[in-house]
Amino acid sequence: MRTLTLQLGAWLLAFAAACSTAAAEGDSPWGRDYFPNTELVDQDGQHLRFYDDLIAGKVVAINFIFTGCSATCPAETARLRQVQKLLGERVGKELFFYSISIDPAADTPEVLKAYAERFHVGPGWRFLTGDFAAITELRQRLGLLDIRVDPQNKSEHSLSLIIGNQATGQWMKVSPFENPYILADRLGNSLQNWKVASATHNSYADAPQLRTPSPGEQLFRTRCSACHSLGADANAMRQAIGPDLAGVTRRRERAWLERWLREPDRMLAEQDPTATALYRQFNQIGMPNLGLGEVEVQALLGYLADPSADATPRAGSAPPLQQASQ
């Protein structure tokens, strides 16, 4: 009888362990069987496995970049930095950012570390490199590489961002150029099953009256505010990625500004003195070519020339989202 009892107890323990494992891994349809356990190396030289170390049971944001990119990657990194600042100390504890290089031969850990420092990246955000073929497979599994696209063609890399909660199986593809508050809300609230307690209870009666922003203001908020401010104080400018644009239409010639907005990459290649000075002043982060047309250029300059623009609230100026209640 004692032997039977011991055997039954052992079976129950084994069953409980199996159920625990199933609960940990089986609640999500996207688990170890789907995600490759790609070996990667971060900017500090730490070797990590994609599934085991980086995403298992975590809320994450994942994008693919390369440091030699002069078009969209700098703006993408700057926008995600805004999101990181909004989330505050929760990044690295409750959620994690990963930027994976698609040019691992050039993007060594040392290069990635220097790149992260240029953008004043905080804790909880890893920049990763590894084997090209393995990273290519990872891009495909995450839906960020069309099988018809040559993975060697870096100019065709996806600009989308993958955010998700591996434990619940919630995954979505979003634009990194989305409003930073919306991205922060998705990462900090909706993907976390709204576990953050609201610090205040606001009344709709106290809500400010909404106004329709001008086309120029919309352009500034969506294309420029990740790197530029309007009327920032000296303390904020010490961490700035680009110059403050308050009064820029009075400081620069109109023709220079128009061309700079249309083709900053070409002006840098031509070593325009002002463009080169700005490039050196701001950690060699080149302004990306945003593909603005003439109508957009004029709308943006019109907004920047408006004195009221200097008082426009800056994206990213709000305090971090509240910490989760304990």
Positions of predicted regions on the chain:
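A short beta-strand-turn-helix
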Residues: 39-59, 208
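Short active-site neighborhood of thiol/selenol oxidoreductases, capturing the structured segment around
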Residues: 50-74, 80
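The canonical Cys-X-X-Cys-His
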Residues: 70-73, 161, 216, 222-231, ...
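Structural microenvironment flanking redox-active thiols in thiol-disulfide oxidoreductases
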Residues: 76-138, 253
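Short, internal strand/loop/helix patches
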Residues: 114-158, 267-286
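Electrostatic cytochrome c docking/interface patches
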Residues: 193-221, 234-241
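Gly/Gly-Pro-rich "capping" loops immediately C-terminal to redox-active cysteine motifs
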Residues: 229-263
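Axial heme c-ligation environment in periplasmic c-type cytochrome domains
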Residues: 238-247, 264-296
